[in-house]
Structures are given as structure tokens and as C-alpha cells.
């Protein structure tokens, strides 16, 4: 299972499906899938004995349009165990998730998602989406500023040329009228 997590990172379009907690994730609905890898200690304790061994854990996030699920699969486990699962109308539009490069960041991500799960998650995601949309519109308007400025200059030049032509015609008319008056006066 570890190899499949490694090979199918960033490849949601392949014919794959992961099943955990009786919830299959279809590849057609997968929007984003990536892995966090870190080397941790997996310990199991019971009333009689306790043991700890090093294992490579793959922390994976699978997103679709209605759920967000966080998996962790180790080399000793036969199937990935689900850590955090959110379902509902979480994603109204594109929600960017940033890939953390530090090894311990996956642990902090689990803590963060666990903390968020105890709070009201959907309003917070809605606020984040509103902020991202406003940021996108702001960046989009900044990118459009040179075009708006160039077209604005053209529009201003057009109106100024019209106004200046009209003004020049008025001046010529005034000059012709004064010349005609002067000729009449001299006659």
C-alpha cells in the first residue's frame, strides 16, 4: 500500500480508488491528492507489554467536492487508517492546500485539522474562500491595470482630439467672423 501512495501522488486522473472507513474515493471526483512523508515512532502499548519501532508513515490528503479525508499508512499496517474525515458542503470553489516541506509539519497539520474539527469548520472555510476570491479579484484587477491604462489613454485621446478639433473650429469661426467684420467696417 505504501508503494501505491508513493506512485499515485499528484495523479488523480488514473484509474485508482482508495477505500477507508467504508467510504470509497472515486478518481473522477478527486481534485487534489498529495502525500506528506515523515519518519516517526509507532508505539503500541497494552496491559502486558509495550513496544516501539520506527516506521515510515505516509500522510495523505484526498479532496473531492464534498469531503476532505486525511489518511496515514505505515509499512506495518495492511490498509491506510483514517485520521480525520470531514464531509459536507465544504468546498464551494477551489481551495488551495499548501505542501509543507518540513518533516514535522505533517504532525502539526494533523493537530491543526483536529483542532479545526472541534470548531465550526464550514463557516471558517467559507470565510477563507471569500478571502481567496477577494484576493483573486484584487490580483486580477492589478494585472488588468496596464490594459485599462492603455485603453483609458486611448479613450482620453479620442475625447481630447474631438474637443480640440471642436475648439479649433470655433477659433477659426471666430477669426473668420472678426475678419468679415473688419472688412465690412473698412468698406
UniProtKB/Swiss-Prot annotation:
Membrane topology: Multi-pass membrane protein
UniProt keywords, alphabetically: Membrane, Transmembrane, Transmembrane helix
Keyword Transmembrane helix: yes
Domain of life: Eukaryota
Signal peptide: none
Entry keyword annotation includes Isomerase: no
Primary site of residence: membrane
Gene Ontology CC: membrane
Subcellular location: Membrane
Protein name as annotated: Putative uncharacterized protein YPR142C
